[in-house]
Amino acid sequence: FFIFLSQSGETADGISVMKKFKNYSSLVITNNLESTMVRLGNFALDILAKKEVAVASTKAYMAMIVVCAMLARQVSGLNTNLKNNLKAVCIAIEEVLENKELFKGISEEIVASENVFYIGRGIDYWTSLEASLKLKEVAYISTEAYSSGELKHGPIALINDKSFVLAIITQEGTNL
């Protein structure tokens, strides 16, 4: 059984993989129930984000994370407090919006940087990859994401006083 994630449901690589593994059952999690991937799959789950207008596709990305968290909770049988966790995310977003001047200053530093690096460990690495992509899409600047464990094996040579490094740390006990 395979689970495929695609906001558009038209991703060429995703379609190619689905065709290759057509003998297996699959669930497609998408924002487009009329897509090719949905037609190729056995089951579909709509993230209900509606039409995405922004290039960075943040609304659909966040909706996909929520749907995946709900699915993981259901499949695992764990009684996690997903509702409270989602409320905490909303509160954090409100705090960012309430501190516009602080984040405006940080964003100006980021844009003025020669290059930007996101680092994260474990699941935070995947968030780093997405954050790097979002920054490329909206600011058109050079940015890369690395697993923090890989940092000393090459990428650290690129970091200088004109670099900006953002560490994504959401897991308790994480050592970068």
Spans of model-derived segments:
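Amphipathic coiled-coil/heptad-repeat helices and related helical stalk/stem segments
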Residues: 14, 102-103, 151-152, 176
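Solvent-exposed alpha-helices and their adjacent loops that cap or buttress functional pockets
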Residues: 20-22, 36-39, 108-111, 157-160
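Generic recognition of flexible, low-complexity loop/linker segments
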Residues: 33, 104-107, 153-156
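Glycine-rich phosphate-binding loops that contact phosphosugars or nucleotide phosphates
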Residues: 1-89, 121, 168-176
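Cofactor-pocket helix-loop regions in the catalytic cores of large enzyme subunits
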Residues: 85-120
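Short acidic (Asp/Glu) and glycine-rich catalytic loops that position anionic groups and cofactors
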Residues: 46-51, 111-112, 159-163
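Anionic-ligand anchoring segments at beta-strand to alpha-helix junctions in alpha/beta enzyme folds, i.e.
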Residues: 1-2, 10, 24-27, 112-161
